[in-house]
């Protein structure tokens, strides 16, 4: 393994500057039409995200557009394609924490809530009350990172 020379305080480390010139230009194929930066910003062709793989469905009853030089045999009528609603999976968010992770999160949240209500003079909540489903630990002073092992 090569030995790296340590730079002293008089010689600061040089980092590679990443800019517009360090990103490869789009090559015209699907893989290189969109670039996503480290901050999540995207640039390039993002039209495929809004189309879901094709143009809008043809109007019902409208004749199909056929090039004048090609003759296609008549096709059998097909059932109409269901158009996805705007609230399809793109706008919904589902997170499954699982039973043990959910219990740990609820226990920490309830412990914090009970600590804040215990400091109020007129609070009638019981201090150190955990969520009824909490089985993770009896010490409610643990932070969430400690409970889940981070």
From Swiss-Prot:
Coarse class of the protein's main subcellular location: membrane
Taxonomic superkingdom: Eukaryota
Reported tissue expression: Highly expressed in the skeletal muscle.
Assigned keywords, A-Z: Cell shape, Cytoplasm, Cytoskeleton, Membrane, Methylation
Keyword hit for Plastid: no
Pfam hit, one: PBD
A biological-process GO annotation: positive regulation of pseudopodium assembly
Record's compositionally biased regions (Pro residues): 55-66, 74-87
Positions of the CRIB domain: 23-37
Modified residues (Omega-N-methylarginine): 38
Region (Disordered), start-end ranges: 1-20, 34-89, 114-133
Membrane topology: Peripheral membrane protein
Record localization: Endomembrane system; Cytoplasm, Cytoskeleton
Cellular compartments per GO CC: cytoplasm; cytoskeleton; endomembrane system; plasma membrane
GO molecular function terms attached to this record: small GTPase binding
Biased composition (Basic and acidic residues): 114-127
Role according to the record: Probably involved in the organization of the actin cytoskeleton. May act downstream of CDC42 to induce actin filament assembly leading to cell shape changes. Induces pseudopodia formation in fibroblasts. Inhibits MAPK8 independently of CDC42 binding. Controls septin organization and this effect is negatively regulated by CDC42.
Subunit structure: Interacts with CDC42 in a GTP-dependent manner, and with SEPT7.
Domain writeup: The CRIB domain mediates interaction with CDC42.
Family affiliation: Belongs to the BORG/CEP family.
Name of the molecule in the record: Cdc42 effector protein 5
Encoding gene (name): Cdc42ep5
């Amino acid at each position: 393994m090569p030995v790296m020379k340590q730079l002293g305080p008089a010689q600061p480390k040089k980092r590679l500057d990443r800019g517009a010139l360090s990103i490869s230009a789009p090559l015209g194929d699907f893989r290189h039409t969109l670039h996503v930066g480290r901050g999540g910003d995207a640039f390039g062709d993002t039209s495929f995200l809004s189309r879901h793989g094709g143009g809008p469905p043809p109007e019902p009853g409208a004749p199909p557009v056929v090039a004048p030089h090609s003759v296609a045999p008549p096709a059998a009528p097909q059932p109409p394609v269901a158009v996805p609603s705007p609230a399809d999976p793109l706008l919904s968010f589902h997170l499954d924490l699982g039973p043990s992770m959910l219990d740990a999160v609820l226990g920490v949240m309830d412990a914090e809530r009970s600590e804040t209500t215990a400091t109020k003079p007129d609070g009638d909540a019981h201090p150190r009350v955990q969520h009824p489903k909490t089985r993770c630990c009896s010490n409610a002073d643990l932070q969430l990172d400690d409970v889940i092992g981070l």
